[in-house]
Amino acid sequence: MKAGSGDQGSPPCFLRFPRPVRVVSGAEAELKCVVLGEPPPTVVWEKGGQQLVASERLSFPEDGAEHGLLLSGALPTDAGVYVCRARNAAGEAYAAAAVTVLEPPAPEPEPESSECPLPTPGTGEGAPKFLTGPQSQWVLRGEEVVLTCQVGGLPEPKLYWEKDGMALDEVWDSSHFKLEPGRGASDEGASLTLRILAARLPDSGVYVCHARNAHGHAQAGALLQVHQPRESPPQDPDENPKPVLEPLKGAPKTFWVNEGKHAKFRCYVMGKPEPEIEWHLEGRPLLPDRRRLMYRDRDGGFVLKVLYCQAKDRGLYVCAARNSAGQTLSAVQLHVKEPRLRFTRPLQDVEGREHGIVVLECKVPNSRIPTAWFREDQRLLPCRKYEQIEEGAVRRLVIHKLKADDDGVYLCEMRGRVRTVANVTVKGPILKRLPRKLDVLEGENAVLLVETQEAGVQGCWSRDGEDLPDTCQSSCGHMHALVLPGVTREDAGEITFSLGNSRTTTLLRVKCVKHSPPGPPVMVEMFKGQKNKVLLTWKPPEPPPETSFIYRLERQEVGSDDWIQCFSIEKAGAVEVPGDCVPTEGDYHFRICTVSEHGRSPHVVFNGSAHLVPTARLVSGLEDVQVYDGEDAVFSLDLSAIIQGSWFLNGEQLQSNEPEGQVEPGALRYRIEQKGLQHRLILQAVKHRDSGALVGFSCPGVQDSAALTIQESSVHILSPQDKVSLTFTTSERVVLTCELSRVDFPATWYKDGQKVEESESLIVKTEGRKHRLILPEAQVRDSGEFECRTEGVSAFFGVTVQDPPVHIVNPQEHVFVHAITSECVRLTCEVDREDTTVHWYKDGQEVEESDIIVLENKGPHHRLVLPAARPSDGGEFQCVAGDERAYFTVTITDVFSWIVYPSSEVHVAAVRLERVVLTCELCRPWAEVRWTKDGEEVVESPALLLEKEDTIRRLVLPSVQLEDSGEYLCEIHDESASFTITVTEPPVRIIYPQDEVTLHAVSLECVVLTCELSREDAPVRWYKDGLEVEESEALVLQSDGPRRRLVLPAAQPEDGGEFVCDAGDDSAFFTVTVTAPPERIVHPAARSLDLQFGAPGHVELRCEVAPAGSQVRWYKDGLEVEVSDALQLGAEGPARTLTLPHAQPEDAGEYVCETRDEAVTFNVSLAELPVQFLAPEAAPNPLCVVPGEPVVLSCELSRASAQVFWSHNGSPVQQGEGLELRAEGPRRILCIQAADLAHTGVYTCQSGASPGAPSLSFNVQVAELPPVKLVSELTPLTVHEGDDATFQCEVSPPDAEVTWLRNGAVITAGPQLEMVQNGSSRTLIIRGCQLKDAGTVTARAGAADTSARLHVRETELLFLRRLQDVRAEEGQDVHLEVETGRVGAAGTVRWIRGGEPLPLDSRLTTAQDGHVHRLSIHGVLLTDQGTYGCESRHDRTLARLSVRPRQLRELRPLEDVTVHEGGSATFQLELSQEGVTGEWAQGGVRLHPGPKCHIQSEGRTHRLVLSGLGLADSGCVSFTADTLRCAARLTVREVPVTIVQGPQDLEVTEGDTATFECELSQTLADVIWEKDGQALSLSPRLRLQALGTRRLLLLRRCCSSDAGTYSCVVGTARSEPARLTVREREVSVLRELRSVSAREGDGATFECTVSETEITGRWELGGRALRPGGRVRIRQEGKKHILVLSELRTEDTGEVCFQAGPAQSLARLEVEALPLQMCRRPPREKTVLVNRRAVLEVTVSRPGGHVCWMREGVELCPGNKYETRRHGTTHSLVIHDVRPEDQGTYSCQAGQDSADTQLLVDGD
């Protein structure tokens, strides 16, 4: 039998989620989802957290894994979010969807045009319905297209067509569209035909026919595709085809894209008629395919998108647009950037048949590079569908069970997003599949196309598994179209086209159009004029929302964070909120927002808050209460609103600010409660003297009262008030207590209606008011109902006594059992008690004992035995013991084969002399087998052993030999197990060398590598540097017995390296180093040479080395040379050269050529050559110049450092005086800056001072200056004032000096005068001419001159900015301004009024600022009104000044005033005018002078004084005069309360009463008493009293903790602190404690009498403080203090101490222990399996007793092996990990009682 783990199944998983639904009120709403799971899940529907149940309108249809919710007659209340929750044993899943219920559409008038918005689709009988819809068509350009639709409906609907969402008259070129209205067949419905004459390519699109009437709207669409007809080939084959496109005039734009990325081209073309667009690549037209998408975006642009670009996509892309008016082109050059890391072998396009497989294969550069597969943008994970294989660097993707949707672009991507792309073509009935997904904006048209292989076939369109209506489907030949016009969110889903077994699917996603929410209301205001009401006003949002909207008003109580909705208002701009609208009294904030179908605006909060009080009504009033003496009396009433109220008792108001209070010391106590609308008054423990009391309740609008009646009762039960249910375990102590209202009153106990009788097992006790029934050791038979009965009243106790719970010790976990047919199966369950009865269940049914199932019970062990198991006996078994269960899963396997192992052929590889064991496992231990080798039965011998052990059969070869190789069979019946043994020799070992060998040799020396093996015939392989060597003349391999040699007869340096002798299982390593021969210089023979060369010249130093491959180094003067253009190194064969192409004298020196072993020296000297003139090569021609012209003489020498001498006519030339001598490298230059006649002559440049040195001569000739003359004359000019005047003339020569004169005076350049020289031209410019600039202008050059006259005309002074009419208020300053075209002199303009010059007035001022002239009138008067003008000699402008009387306004406004009650308030304001008469008002009522009202007016100041103010005078105070009204707030507050006399210091004795008193200034005021700065709260010892203006604090039974400082606080006033001192009371013990001896379980009483009554004592037992509760009761009767201890225990023994102040009394408590006995003993014998744990358990007579566990008489100590437990009276010993050595006798010692258990260990 073998154990395993079970399968937990799979949790629920949603294959299709429910989708949101929008329905009209009254229609059906249906939600559907598909959910799977193992086991099949249970599905429930919820809404608002509540599970839904089926009803008349609600049902839950199910169809396999599909679950639905069907809602009939949907109502607005049904709207909300519905949750589908699926559960099974493996988990839980849920999905949600929203249901929106719309109001039914209201009838609308018939629209006038197609621009009207469409109404919501109707569902009534008269709504439009398409009888015949338009059909999609595919036509060639120039053909005629006819689209027809026929619609029924009442009234007859109006029809109109749209193209791509636009009305036909909005289409750019619709002149060839023709509409033909008509009637349908049989005169049924209306029809409208759209005829398109000579269709053009731009006519392609979606055409939608709309039908509308008063009941609703319907629409149907069709797709029209117009194709370009194919061009016919030319008739003349020799004729070259015409180019498709015109050549580009300019260079195209360039676009780069990384390989594998997308490229997007967009062009925007305009024209009329609308152009036709074609895309071309390198002159070839492009058609859309998998990687080339062509479409038109929403902005009208034409887009070409190339997906996953490859190298073959590079080229020139052209967008060609043409219409009847012409054509235009736009081009871009696409470059595809290839990555550095590339696929070694990229993907190739593949084809496959539907339902077949295809394989994509590529190769990466490195096998360790990870890759990922994609189908377009979707990552593919390995699965049965997509098998991904990696073999080294090869990557394969195998696509199984091809479908039409598998057609597409596939990518393999490695790191760096490097991709290789391939197309997968799926051949099948569907040629062109649907796109993976389609995104459409809400309201747009959705078009889906499918092309099939065969024409005329009928396909099926569906959405989310539901067939779509025929009106939106069209087919034409091979093409099938689905047109969904005006899609909504409900149209979203999975669209499928099915054709036989083929199908293609797309995900239609509808994107919602974003609508902006409405704006918030504006100008919100709050008015609180009326009591308990508030008026809220606002204005509509700006701009107003386009759709209908409402206002939502919300409130928030001050101090709370929650806003609660008050009203929803449609059109009102104001609302009054009364107090009845709030639930509780308080201050409230308000806010408002605008709500429409597009959302909600931000909230706007009204400033301030309003105090509102709900109007309460009495819902349930007070009722008279009758109770018994000592009981609580409860008075309650319910109100209609949450409001505060006051309780009264006999006319005295009860304090409601404290939860508990007392009417007066020693009198009735009460508690006030308020929960929501309910108010309660609880009078606690009422006495007979309180009978007849009158209880009242009062709040605004409600007053009620009731009477209290106390009834006398002989006795009643204080506790328990209700029936008590108790549960105990056997042997546990049970105590039932009933407390009566009277002491020592008799009571009788009953059980199940029968009077009980006292015995040892049932004890009845009475102590004062308490009556007890005790069951010392309860048994199961003691269960029942107990009753304590007295004087007609009873207390009931339900007692249940149960056995202790049973625990399953073994197994602790789920057990899985595997067995075969006829095998015996045992299921064992061990419990912790022997007397426990267990029940066995199989697959939920209780099993019964039979021949095939045996049940065994032995002590705590319970077994279920299947003697001969069958497959049908398998299943889930449970062993149930009490509340615990043990689980077993049994699997019985039928035997189809005798041989269990091995199930396949076994191959065994062994070496000679090794031990080989062949094992075969059978399903039956008694089966006999037959062993054969190579077909012959084997014979057992010392060399071949046959073994048998249970079901195992073995063949053993102790020392296998080579001849033992072969096929061995273990045969039984018709079966056999095959073993193939292959015996080989033991591995070869290398004896020598054991370590790595290192050899050093010289070139041509013989090198021998030797290796000795452990076997002579063992083959070896030799390797050098990892490569196997090949024998040759230079490398010889030898074999001599066990020795193997590798010989290098004449080793070379390249023969060095690492050699390995590989003998298969062992290797030897040799490191050989061959040193090369010495490197020698063969030529020249001499080691030092002297060489001489001319400079500059070519120098080459040469030597030959041996061997030819030797490396050399060159040095110059001890430093290694560096290669450059001036020094070159060469090597050819044995020759080594150093070359100086252009040697200079400085290159002379010692040159050394050095090899590793030798060197040769070259002493190089360089002699300079004589200097030669290199340029010019011949004597230069004479140089002729004019005076002033620069002269440059230049020559080039053969040596840059050569010195030259210049001479002029034989005289040396010196630098300076206009001569400059320069040297630039080999060039020598003489420069004459400005030649004159003295510079004429021969200039000579001589190289060196020695006679006969080379020289070069230059002949320079300077011509005489020509005469200066004027070539052109000046021209007279006439200009306007402010313009520029330009005079120009020409002179010869061009550099002649010219002087300008005006009116005979020489002029110079300045801001107004500008002089310009340009060659021979001379110009004078006079800027901004003035009248004074007129005159004669002269230009003088040498002796010649020319003159011209300048005339300046005056410019008209015109107004550019004219006067504007002005309106002003009396007393303001007025400014009139004009702007002139030019800046005139002062006085050129004048101001007039009424046609006359301005009068002299100090209030009138004029000013000029450049072009601006300004008239200012200060403090304008009514008399200043009139027409004002400004005029010049050439222009005039007028304007009207209107003056209105001065407006009355406030200079200093009214201010809010706050005063205390009885005080006075002064309001004052200052106006802008004097002598104004106004009215004062308060709260809207006009005020008149009186004793409390004083009104004053002084000049512009107005004052109001109000005196003797009260709280009711708070409100608004206003002043009104003419059109002016201003207001302020008057706030009257209560006079603050003050403390007239504070509390005084007190000193009291402990236990006495302390009284503090303070006196206030007012009678009605609340006082807070504080102690040490902390507020005091009411308690039984603390009382507060109010006597007029006096406030008392009474502190009863003072103790030391009451000492401290006390003060009273009222408002902001605080009294001086008063100190309370508490003196300790002298206490003495009058009667000492007495010691007590008692037996365990009994009680003990201690009494102590002290000298003082009001004293608190403290009890201790054994040093521990005692507190009442449980087994301890403490009470005080006057001076006597009593301690009662019940149910004594041995640990209670100790010293009892009572202490009261300094007094103390001690006594001794002795508790005699009862003998400890065993109630339940452990079993005499217990059997435990090995490695399990054993539990021994014993129950003793009382808890707390000591139990000792021993083994073989030795006490056991707790630890890892042994664990002791105690639970009440039960003691356990747990032995962990039981071993055979743990077997023996275990003893338990409890007091004088003991018990033994024999522990037996079963198993190996």
UniProtKB/Swiss-Prot annotation:
| The organism of origin for this protein | Mus musculus (Mouse)
Give the stretches traversing the membrane.
none
Name this protein carries in UniProt: Obscurin-like protein 1
Region feature (Interaction with TTN)? 17-19, 85-94
List localization entries: Cytoplasm; Cytoplasm, Perinuclear region; Golgi apparatus
Query: In UniProt terms, what function does this protein have?
Result: Core component of the 3M complex, a complex required to regulate microtubule dynamics and genome integrity. It is unclear how the 3M complex regulates microtubules, it could act by controlling the level of a microtubule stabilizer. Acts as a regulator of the Cul7-RING(FBXW8) ubiquitin-protein ligase, playing a critical role in the ubiquitin ligase pathway that regulates Golgi morphogenesis and dendrite patterning in brain. Required to localize CUL7 to the Golgi apparatus in neurons.
Q: Which Gene3D superfamilies match?
A: Immunoglobulins (2.60.40.10)
SS bond partners = C33-C84, C149-C209, C267-C319, C362-C412, C738-C788, C829-C879, C920-C970, C1011-C1061, C1103-C1153, C1195-C1245, C1289-C1430, C1558-C1608
